[in-house]
Amino acid sequence: PVSAMIGKTKEDKAVKQDILKKHTLEGVISLNKDTFYRVGTNPCIAIFTAGEPHQADKKAKFINFEDDGFEVKKHLGLVETERAKDKRQYLLDCWRGKVADFPSSFMVETTVEDTDEWLHSFYYYNDEIPTEADFMNSIADYLTFEFNMITHGKGYLFGQKGGDGNA
């Protein structure tokens, strides 16, 4: 599960450190959250080369394969769509280095340390420039939030003097 790649506890961190001392992390593939439908786990696949210590300059691949071409259908569970085969092939082509210009939203190649989260989401930086509509929506959301806070007596959070004795 994804939680094993995060390493929150001391024990988890020690395990990750021990793994890299003896094995090379080649990459981690984050899977569709519905892969094990109704089980309640976020699955991933970690790929290692056994018996070779992980070198500090070794780049590992972190792939977001949550959109794998499978969908949950009512009364059927997880069902393969017509896109699944192409998505699987694209994953394999990226993994094998046959695709050089992959989007960072799909795959990131980077060096790792035992203290890092070994997940695509840890390394991914959204490099897309927001549209004007995205900006306007963010401003509208903020103004709605601020108005709501002020009307509920929390104007002091925004530097306003109010009847509540704050600010």
Residue map of PLM features:
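A conserved structural/catalytic subdomain of Rossmann-like adenosyl-cofactor enzymes
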Residues: 1-167
